[in-house]
Amino acid sequence: MIEVTLLGTGSPIPDARRAGPSTLVRAGGQTFLVDCGRGVLQRAAAVGVGANQISALLLTHLHSDHIADLGDVLITRWVSNFAPDLPPLPIIGPPGTAEVVENMLKAFSFDIGYRIAHHDDLTTPPPVEVEEVTDGVVWGRDEVSIRVGPTDHRPVTPTIGFRIEHHGASVVLAGDTVPCRGLDKLAAGAGALVHTVIRRDLIEALPMQRIRDICDYHSSVEQAAETATRAGVGILILTHYVPTLQPGQEDDWRALAATRFDRQIEIGDDLHRVQVHPGVCAKPAG
């Protein structure tokens, strides 16, 4: 079984009820953090997960709302782990990730220096191990495998999605994307698809062109549902709601998805959990 927790279901626009985009995936005793939007560690703490328990950080792309708390994750993992030899944090993301991580650590260089000077058991900066990928298998430990596939969030490029598998259960995390062949291939036959969504009907009615531009490179609720249907997934999990999902609107969003996808649809607030069991997907892709 794989457990998916929507840590942050918000967007770039600050929302008092929603943290920034981030999803926690637990499988085979391992814990994967997918993106790290604002407030991610507070939300992780609410489900009993600390920064020092993260097996790997997976980044779908380098938009600010998806990496806003990267520095907090790196520093907090470092200072809250008391093992004598802290292993590097695996960080897997698209090309450009290494530069972002390097610059983030530079931004915290004063803080890092203060802590090394103060604490005898902190002798080196936060250890990281960055892998930049666009396609292929990136993880295979203790019967958990992770595969990466390309998505389409242009002009943001390259962007990637992740497929996590464990003992016959599988979850795909799409990140921000429009419908594309790469995501269809990655999600084919998966137990669950976690997909960011927008309400195109609401956004296109707004007067600000910069806001309407969002429609260019995000999937609408209906498009995400169509992707799930084409891929034959068992559960569609919606997140990253734009505009923000207001209390009482859940059924409206779910109904839109249900016009294009006739299986289980999950939508909710931060900390919403979904269990994905082996064999949950009974439909072939196509």
Curated annotation (Swiss-Prot):
Zn(2+) 1 binds at residues 61, 63, 153, 176. Zn(2+) 2 binds at residues 65-66, 176, 240. It comes from the Bacteria. Binds 2 Zn(2+) ions. InterPro entries: AtsA-like_MBL-fold, Metallo-B-lactamas, RibonucZ/Hydroxyglut_hydro, RNase_Z/BN. SMART domains: Lactamase_B. GO terms for molecular function: 3'-tRNA processing endoribonuclease activity; metal ion binding. Keywords: Endonuclease, Hydrolase, Metal-binding, Nuclease, tRNA processing, Zinc. The active site is at 65 (proton acceptor). It catalyses: Endonucleolytic cleavage of RNA, removing extra 3' nucleotides from tRNA precursor, generating 3' termini of tRNAs. A 3'-hydroxy group is left at the tRNA terminus and a 5'-phosphoryl group is left at the trailer molecule. Its EC number is 3.1.26.11. Pfam families: Lactamase_B_2. Disulfide bonds: none annotated. Gene3D superfamilies: Ribonuclease Z/Hydroxyacylglutathione hydrolase-like. Its cofactor is Zn(2+). Zinc phosphodiesterase, which displays some tRNA 3'-processing endonuclease activity. Probably involved in tRNA maturation, by removing a 3'-trailer from precursor tRNA. Belongs to the RNase Z family. NCBIfam families: PRK00055.2-4. Homodimer. HAMAP family: RNase_Z_BN. This is Ribonuclease Z. The lineage of its organism: Bacteria, Bacillati, Actinomycetota, Actinomycetes, Mycobacteriales.
